[in-house]
Amino acid sequence: MFRILFFILAFTTHAFAQDTSMTAERLAQIIMDIDPDAAITPSGIELTIEDIPVLVVMAPAADRMRAMVPIASVEDVTPEEMSRMMQANFDTALDARYAVAQDRVWGVFIHPLGALEREQFLSAIAQTVNLARTYGTLYSGGAQVFGGGDSNDIYQGLVDDLLNRGQDI
């Protein structure tokens, strides 16, 4: 009797669970809540956060998404700056990373699309923007700062601002 009940519950519970997977449509709505002037382009969705351009690219068939912020031309990067970016990728860039592609330095966050949560995405956008803002100085995603400086408050202010734009979708 208990085996039958367990079998029924095991195979029907999933059918009643609400699907909370991130979709391209849901992510696009979150982006529009962040920046109502965001534009859908052939390459993705372009938005602006604090005067910094952000490009979000999605590949639903591959279950991937990428948020990218252009930072600098590779030609202008010194070996010392490149080394500093690699160090930052290890300890201060956090979930976002410095990357090089198409002769540019980028702040990039890459994640499986379906597993992405709203707050995680908003934190990722804040981190990629902070990589651009702190390039050449702190090289920090800003989410975790050790010590009593001002950086954590600046980062938290950006995350709070993004969280307050729009409703949960």
PLM segments and residue spans:
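Short, internal acidic amphipathic alpha-helical interface segments
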Residues: 68-110
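Short glycine-rich, low-complexity/disordered patches
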Residues: 40-46, 95-103, 137-155
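N-terminal secretory signal peptides
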Residues: 18-65, 71-75, 79-80, 88, ...
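Sec-dependent N-terminal signal peptides
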Residues: 4-13
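Sec/Tat-exported extracytoplasmic proteins
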Residues: 31-38, 89, 132-139, 143
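A short, solvent-exposed beta-edge/loop patch
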Residues: 96-137
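C-terminal partner/receptor-binding element of secreted or periplasmic proteins
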Residues: 124-169
